[in-house]
Each structure stands twice: as C-alpha cells, then as structure tokens.
Amino acid sequence: MVAKWCVLAMCLLVAVGADKCPRATDQEAKQKRMLEVLQHVNKPYVAETKDPKIPAGSEDVFKHLGILEKHEVFSLFDERQWDEATTAAVYMLTAPSFDEFIDRAEIVRHRINEDMFYYAFSVAAVHRDDTRGINLPRIHEIYPDKFLKHKVIVEVKNSINSGQEDPLIDATHEFTDLRDPNSKLHYFLEDVGLNSHHYHWHVIHPAVWQESLEELTHQHKDRKGELFYFMHHQMVNRYDAERLSNGLPRSTTFENWNDPIETGYAPHLTIDRTGYRYQFRPDNLVVRDLPELTKNHMRQWRDRILYAVHRGEALAANGSSVSLRDERGIDVLGNMVESSLQSINRPFYGNVHCYAHVIAARIADPDGKYGEDNGAMYDVATSARDPLFYQWHKFIDNLFHEYKDALKAYSSEDLTYNDITIEEVNVQGEGGSPANTVTTFLENSIVHLDEGFSFTARGHARVKVQHLQHEGFNYQIKVNNAGGEHKVVFRVFLAPKYDEEHHEFDFNEQRGMAIELDKFVATVPAGSSTVEQHSSKSSVTQSNDNFYGSSATRSSENHCSCGWPDYLLIPKGNHQGVQFNVYVIATSYDEDHVESDESCHCGDSLSYCGALYDKYPDRRPMGYPFDRHADAQTFDEFKTKNMNSVTVTIKHTGEVKDA
C-alpha cells in the first residue's frame, strides 16, 4: 500500500477561513506597469521618461537619496549604503495604493543608483499586499553582465552590431586549467541559478529589515536569523560536496586575517553600461585595513560573539542579558552574526559578516589609491562565484557550530517516534539506473537578453549556457506503523560517505556536512506501507523556469520565487560514481506543526526561504536531527527505529543535453 503524501507547505498548518496572504488582484495589469518601471534599469537604449517632481511633503525623504554615485555597484554588504537603500525601500513600501507605489518608484528611480533602485524596488514589491505574487524579472535578467563573462557580452554586442537578428551566442565552452583546481568548479561557482538564488534570498530576507518595518507592514520575519545560518550552511555543504565529486579537498576556513589567501579569483565581469570591472584577486594576497575599518575591529567583533556563544548569553543594547540557550537562541545569534538591523546590539557585536565581504573585495586596492573597482565578494549578485565566499562562510558556519556544540545532545528518547519504524530506504532513478544509483549530466539552457542594454541596442539576443542536471528519482520508504493512522514528517538528507583521502567519515563530521534534500508529510496507515516522494517536489528547490523562463509566464503560485535551483539538487558525482548516504528521519506531525497560513508560505522552497509573512511552518530546529553534536561515532549508534539510511552512488555521465 502506498501512503498518501503532501508537501510540508500543504500540511504543516492550520488555516481557517480566508487566506491571510491572498495574491494581488489584477496581476497582469500590475505586472505590466511594474515592468515598465524596470525596463529602464541598466538599459541606456530605452527611451527615458520625464523626470517627475518630488511631491510636496516628501522633501525630507529625498535628502537621504542620491548619495551612491550612479556608476557604482550597490552592495548590501556595505553598511554605508544601508540608510539610502532602506529609505528608498520604505518610501515605496509604504505607498498607500498601487498607483502611488508606481508613482513613487518613478520618482525614486530618477534619483538614485539604478542597482540600488532595483534592490529597493524588489524588496518593496515582495512585501506589499497589493503586489504579492507578481513575478518580476530576476537579477540576471536585469543585470546579465553580472552573470555572463565580458567576452560573452562583447560577442553579443558584435553580433547585433553586425546586423544579426536575435543571435544565439554559445557560452558553454569553459576550459579546465590544471594550474587552477577551482576551474573544475566553474559549472557550480558561476552558475546563473545559484547566484540568482543567493541575491533573491537577500531580497526576501533583507539585512535592513527591522522592527519599525514590521510595525508598518504587520509582517514578522519569523526565524530570519536561523534562516541566514541554515541557508548559508547548506551552500557551504553543497560546495564541499562538489569539491569531493571533482577529486578536490574540502574548502579551508578563512579565519586568520593575517594569513595570505591562497586562492585567487578572476571574475571576468564588467558592467557594460558603466565600465565597472570587478577586481581580480591574485593568489596569496593578505587583507589589509580599510580607511573606515581595521582588521582589529573585525577581531574584536568576532571575539565578542564567541564570548557570548561560550557564556550562553548575549548583551542587548539596553544592557540586559539575552539567553542563547533557549529555542530562540539560534535566531538571536543568526541576527548578530549576519549583522542585520535585527541584531540585539549592533554597536557592540558589529558587522563581522558583511564587512568581511567588503574588506576581501577591496584586497588589491584597499584605500582606493589606484581607483580600482571592487571584487566579486562586494556584490550579493556575484559573491558566490568566488571560492573565497565559501571559505569565509565556513568561518561564519563555525561560529554556529561552536554554539550548537554547546547544546545538549539529543537523547534516544528525544529522537524516537514510538509507533513508526522505517524498515528500508531506497532511491530509484527514472533513467534506467540500478536501484540506489542516480545519474547527473550537463544541460544547455537559454538566457534571453532583452533589447535596450548597451550590448543589445538594436535587438534581442540569446546566450546558451550550461549547467548541471540530474535524472528524476523517487525516494521509496518502507514504513511500519504499530499504531493508528499517523501524519508523519519525513526529513531527507544526503551526505558524502568518504573524505578526500577515501576514509569513511566519522558520523559527527559527516552530520555537519549533511545536505537537506526534502521535507514532506505523508499520511501513514496502520501496518506496513511504502511512502514515495519524487525529487521534483523538493522543499528545498524552485523550478528551472524561474531561472530560464520569462517573468511574464512564470507561475504566481508562491509569493517568493525563492529557492535553490532544482537542477542543482544533488552533487555532480563523477564517472566512476561517488558514494553518498541518504538519511530519512520520521518525526511526528502533531509535535512539529506550527499554526501557519499556507497562503503566506514560500511555496517553492520552505526549507531555505520559510514563510514571507507568517510563522515558519516547522517547530524543529533547521537541520534537525543533524544540527547538534551526537554522542555517537556512527549512524548505527545514533539512529532510532524511526530513522534509516541507504548508500547511493551518484554517477556523472558526461552527456550534454538540451533543456
């Protein structure tokens, strides 16, 4: 008997009456007007509209706008730009009607940096009631020159200027340089969807969100600090899984700021309209003090955070102590480490996460002596391309590991689900592979470039890019239920089985590398049954159409369009096959569910993106039960009867297919 299943978004809730977060009305008409505003961003060859006047009564607002120069790149990591970005976003977010929102957007657009405008407009649009669910162009559609190398942009420009109509440029030819081991990872580091996801996550959960905005919008960002920890923790784990798949050691931690950064990086990115060229970082440079920030400040902030972690309490701005040992502790710590405006004491705990991005991005010209532009680490849209991003976030991750390791390990009683036994787990691919073998391959997709960019002045163009893809597969979970019918939450993780030296991981080391693949609910009848779930229904990912489709045709079924690319759900593996453990843990729906309205959820990717306007619909800590130190050396010692695992081999076929 196959049990009924439903995704967590559908089940971990108790919704009564009308939707709390209904989608906006007149979506098509509103989307058209919003696209008309955005069509001018980064497009000098679109006819400009008349500069609207500042309305009476708004003069004080505009005293704080126009500070960041037009030719610069906006950085959410650079705190000096936060006030202006927040002012712009709040001014648009608090417009009393949709028409007023559009009017305010046009006024703001003419007066601030375009890069900053796109971010502020996106934050406002995502969080306004009357624009909820309306799809906007993603960052790679507005700024394709932040995602496509400059040589590709030049080829596009030359093709159009020579008279070609709708040319197709092939950007799939990337070569591995044996002198640069990280060149094996271009398919991951420079993936359009991965970097677009990272940018959009920071739109959904902006660091500049604060209590005053919650009061204005009546929207509480539930567990935002914990989401910052977990999403970036998962990015680091996924990066290390790709490194192991390519025969590379796991990334090192960037933690001693006096040591040379061994890994250089050349972005090969230029904003064509302005000539802004992302800085190249040679091997073995050492970060230096900035005029506005010293490394000693960074060390002081780090030490204060670690002191709070080890004491189990943090110092609030009003002088009171805030416990880090209760269920809110990880969220409080997440806001402190991200250095968001929801940090309980920003003057004391500082801005260690964001300013490390800034200090690393200016490593070759820290004081601006040579007039160089900043590196990829400076920009949220480009930072995840740089291997240093993962080394830095591994340091950030270690702050959270210190915290988690200080918590009491889960006992067998904590972990056991009395009536439920998982008897067997299998993973079955759809491509004819043997059981518990899944194949990956390369897939070609098309990035569409609209007319009006400096490189598409005379027409549209298309660019063929290549990304990882995998065959579809099913989880097959054999369950025995010793009681009556149960609603069960199934948590699915994947972790590499062997390290770079081909030694099997100790369980505590492995659980820290676990990648969440899915989290879903099934109604399990009494007795024996089999629960099946398809990989395409993952609670972690969003569909490929959100990256390579048109904003006009994308589904508006969820408010966020947030999540990891579906095609990167599993690591690449290799031709011989890389072994991973898939773990499945069953927990009680009755204990886990949180009263939450489905209409408010980020429908594509609950695990990474949460609920935009409501409670996170899962009571357990993110990453449970692998989030804490275990008093066990192996999974067999750790597991209870409601857990099981299987070894899965991921093989890369080397095939290239068209999407």
From Swiss-Prot:
Residue sites binding Cu cation A per the record: H198, H202, H232
UniProt cross-references to PROSITE patterns, sorted A to Z: HEMOCYANIN_1 (PS00209), HEMOCYANIN_2 (PS00210), TYROSINASE_2 (PS00498)
Does Glycoprotein count among this protein's keywords? yes
Q: Where in the cell is it found?
A: Secreted, Extracellular space
A Gene Ontology cellular-component term: extracellular region
Residues that carry a glycan = N318
User: What superkingdom heads the lineage?
Assistant: Eukaryota
Signal peptide bounds: 1-18
Query: Keywords, A to Z?
Result: Copper, Disulfide bond, Glycoprotein, Metal-binding, Oxygen transport, Secreted, Signal, Transport
Q: In which tissues is this gene expressed?
A: Hemolymph.
Q: Could you tell me which InterPro entries the record lists for this protein?
A: Di-copper_centre_dom_sf, Hemocyanin/hexamerin, Hemocyanin/hexamerin_mid_dom, Hemocyanin_C, Hemocyanin_C_sf, Hemocyanin_N, Hemocyanin_N_sf, Ig_E-set
Q: Which PANTHER family match?
A: LARVAL STORAGE PROTEIN/PHENOLOXIDASE, PHENOLOXIDASE 2-RELATED
| Protein's name according to its UniProt entry | Hemocyanin subunit B
Task: Identify the taxonomic lineage of the organism of origin.
Answer: Eukaryota, Metazoa, Ecdysozoa, Arthropoda, Myriapoda
